[in-house]
Curated annotation (Swiss-Prot):
Intrachain S-S bonds: none
Family: Belongs to the EMC4 family.
Localization, UniProt: Endoplasmic reticulum membrane
One Pfam family in the UniProt entry: EMC4
Oligomer status and interactors: Component of the ER membrane protein complex (EMC).
Provenance organism: Bos taurus
Stretches of the chain found on the membrane's Cytoplasmic side: 2-66, 121-127
Topology class, membrane: Multi-pass membrane protein
Function: Part of the endoplasmic reticulum membrane protein complex (EMC) that enables the energy-independent insertion into endoplasmic reticulum membranes of newly synthesized membrane proteins. Preferentially accommodates proteins with transmembrane domains that are weakly hydrophobic or contain destabilizing features such as charged and aromatic residues. Involved in the cotranslational insertion of multi-pass membrane proteins in which stop-transfer membrane-anchor sequences become ER membrane spanning helices.
Stated name of the protein: ER membrane protein complex subunit 4
Residues recorded with modification N-acetylthreonine: 2
Length: 183
């Protein structure tokens, strides 16, 4: 070992925080060490040629996907207060405006329930997809129940006996009378 090499070695033992960058082989971190072929350019301490994956970005993406899936699942429940306000403003009279409101209140949940498989495809990446799907289904069923309630309060549902008179056969006459004569 040469005198300069032993000095570098001793210096490395005493001061572990010091890195000797000068010298032919004593701690030099040039491209020649990594196979680049150029010994004069130096890499900084801790530099890696390969890209290090950032786990915080992956974690953030997973959290955003979960948040988006919950937004989709809670969408029908968020519409219920607005539907209640529209029901109140439309009134209980049978006219074109309240009838259109009731039709739209019933059609939107039916349409969402028919397209539930497409919605579940968006929820597949979530870890809580069963619970989110259940919340989505309950929200749409509640919207449909509100529409049925509004139809009942407007009198559009056949809930009385008089609503079914068209389907009842008229009673048969047991006898016919004409004045005071028997026929």
């Amino acid at each position: 070992m040469t005198a300069q090499g032993s000095l570098v070695a001793n210096r490395g033992r005493r001061f572990k925080w010091a890195i000797e960058l000068s010298g032919p082989g004593g701690g030099s971190r040039g491209r020649s060490d990594r196979g680049g072929g150029q010994g004069d350019s130096l890499y900084p301490v801790g530099y890696l040629d390969k890209q290090v994956p950032d786990t915080s970005v992956q974690e953030t993406d997973r959290i955003l996907v979960e948040k988006r899936c919950w937004d989709i699942a809670l969408g029908p429940l968020k519409q219920i207060p607005m539907n209640l306000f529209i029901m109140y403003m439309a009134g209980n009279t049978i006219s074109i405006f309240p009838t259109m409101m009731v039709c739209m209140m019933a059609w939107r949940p039916i349409q969402a329930l028919m397209a539930i498989s497409a919605t579940f495809k968006m929820l597949e990446s979530s870890s809580q997809k069963f619970l989110q799907g259940l919340v989505y289904l309950i929200g749409n069923l509640m919207g449909l129940a509100l529409a049925v309630y509004k139809c009942q309060s407007m009198g559009l549902l056949p809930t009385h006996a008089s609503d079914w008179l068209a389907f009842i056969e008229p009673p048969e006459r047991m006898e016919f009378s004409g004045g005071g004569l028997l026929l």
